């Protein structure tokens, strides 16, 4: 008859608590990693679509602006064509500058891994509250 002894007493409860803490921490890390992977996949798909749409938009806008410039230059009297070319160039450069500044401001408001960072902040706050209570 095999006598199987299970640890009894305070040692068992300490080991059980330690195992539960480790398993909870592993589950938390696993959940956060899964969330980060899902968010990265979504951001990758969104970024690819955005770049494709941006490329097509820039291509069509360039052709449209070239056609518009040709029409404007043909519509103006020959003695004012140079002034018309200067004015259209200035307007286009100003629009490009405004668009560049707008793009930089928008890119600085990136939301990459926003939910993951939020969950990690919640975890940190809960751990800090638990450590203060003890």
Curated annotation (Swiss-Prot):
Pfam families associated with the record: Phage_holin_3_6
GO CC annotations, alphabetized: plasma membrane
Full protein name: Inner membrane protein YqjE
The entry's keywords: Cell inner membrane, Cell membrane, Membrane, Transmembrane, Transmembrane helix
Location of this chain's protein in the cell: Cell inner membrane
Residue ranges crossing the lipid bilayer per the database entry: 56-76, 84-104
Keyword Membrane attributed: yes
Lineage: Bacteria, Pseudomonadati, Pseudomonadota, Gammaproteobacteria, Enterobacterales
Membrane topology, record value: Multi-pass membrane protein
Periplasmic side: 77-83
Cytoplasmic side of membrane: 1-55, 105-134
């Amino acid at each position: 008859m095999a006598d199987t002894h299970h640890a009894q007493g305070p040692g068992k409860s300490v080991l059980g608590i330690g195992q539960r803490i480790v398993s909870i921490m592993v589950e938390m890390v696993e959940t956060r990693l899964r969330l980060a992977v899902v968010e990265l996949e979504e951001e990758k798909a969104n970024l690819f679509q955005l770049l494709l749409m941006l490329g097509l938009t820039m291509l069509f806008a360039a052709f449209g602006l070239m056609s518009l410039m040709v029409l404007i230059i043909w519509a103006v009297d020959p003695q004012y064509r140079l002034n018309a070319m200067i004015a259209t160039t200035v307007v286009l450069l100003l629009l490009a500058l405004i668009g560049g500044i707008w793009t930089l401001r928008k890119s600085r408001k990136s939301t990459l891994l926003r939910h993951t960072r939020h969950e990690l902040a919640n975890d940190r706050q809960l751990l800090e509250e638990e450590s203060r209570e003890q």
